[in-house]
């Protein structure tokens, strides 16, 4: 019953450092998105954990980001997502909420382009290293992943999003040839970097950007030696003029790309550890106190109605 559910929210709120009222409101938000009461109660708990281990201002922002990410990464438990964001947010120059904000815009496009969460977080962290503007990084990654798909549909999607599509290549063979030609001089075998794997399938956006990042120093060196302009050609091909700074930030941070990808895979339990620190803090204790006051009045009113 609703009354029984309300009674359980006080313990849930205590466990994550918020109030039963916020858990109840949050549960209602998730139910409006089509979740059952049990699912929504669990999602509300997770959203409040994200809020308390990040720098989000309020539960609405945390929920909005978690909705986008959990819809994109349907095979992952919401806490698995929060673990990765918290772990990388604690160890690199991007905040947990910064990662979530960027992925709110880019997760769907990145999943379509075969990037798992660890790859998406790596691209986001490296893309933010120079710009330090997560919302622009999210929009930039969405653009990069769609431009690297190289289809008319991807071009239309970018156009619908208000992104520039000038010079966008919309056939896979031409996109492949352009990137190989621009990286021939810089590659050790003289063949250039291939955006397709040995089976002829697309590499993920992360695999492509990591491969190009590994060649970055050599591309710059060869451009100087030969008087070519392959770096600019590459940046405009994969990102367009308006988002090329995001692509440049990724290509200049090859070691970060790799280390974030490796660290992200070892994130289990990260959010719970951070949450425990929050619960021991003044803010955490105050939230629990407020929650217990609400529970007291809930029981008083409940006993008076019997």
Regions found by a protein language model. Give the residues of each.
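Heptad-repeat coiled-coil alpha-helical rod/stalk segments, highlighting residues on one face
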Residues: 48, 59, 63-66, 78, ...
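Hydrophobic, low-dielectric interface segments
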Residues: 131-138, 264-306
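Short, Φ-rich (hydrophobic/aromatic) sequence segments
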Residues: 49, 81, 87, 243, ...
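Extended alpha-helical or coil "stalk/linker/tether" regions that are enriched in polar/charged
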Residues: 121-259, 293
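A short, structural motif
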Residues: 1-83, 87-100, 110-118, 130-136, ...
């Amino acid at each position: 019953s609703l009354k029984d559910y309300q009674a359980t929210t006080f313990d849930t709120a205590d466990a994550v450092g918020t109030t039963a009222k916020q858990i109840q409101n949050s549960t209602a938000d998730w139910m409006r998105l089509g979740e059952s009461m049990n699912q929504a109660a669990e999602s509300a708990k997770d959203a409040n954990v994200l809020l308390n281990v990040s720098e989000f201002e309020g539960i609405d922002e945390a929920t909005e980001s978690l909705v986008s990410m959990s819809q994109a990464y349907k095979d992952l438990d919401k806490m698995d997502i929060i673990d990765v964001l918290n772990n990388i947010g604690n160890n690199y120059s991007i905040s947990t909420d910064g990662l979530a904000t960027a992925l709110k815009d880019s997760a769907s496009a990145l999943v379509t382009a075969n990037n798992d969460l660890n790859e998406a977080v790596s691209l986001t962290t490296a893309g933010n290293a120079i710009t330090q503007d997560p919302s622009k990084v999210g929009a930039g990654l969405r653009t990069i992943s769609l431009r690297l798909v190289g289809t008319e549909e991807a071009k239309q999607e970018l156009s619908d999003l208000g992104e520039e599509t000038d010079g966008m290549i919309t056939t896979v063979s031409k996109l492949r040839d352009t990137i190989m030609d621009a990286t021939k001089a810089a590659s050790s075998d003289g063949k250039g970097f291939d955006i397709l794997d040995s089976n002829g399938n697309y590499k993920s956006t992360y695999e492509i950007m990591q491969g190009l990042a590994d060649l970055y120093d050599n591309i710059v060196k060869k451009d100087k030696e030969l008087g070519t302009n392959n770096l600019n050609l590459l940046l405009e091909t994969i990102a367009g003029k308006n988002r090329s700074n995001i692509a440049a930030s990724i290509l200049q941070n090859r070691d970060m790309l790799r280390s974030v990808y490796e660290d992200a895979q070892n994130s289990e339990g990260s959010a719970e550890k951070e949450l425990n620190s929050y619960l021991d803090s003044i803010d955490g204790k105050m939230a629990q106190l407020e929650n217990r006051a609400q529970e007291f009045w809930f029981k008083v009113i409940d006993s008076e109605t019997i």
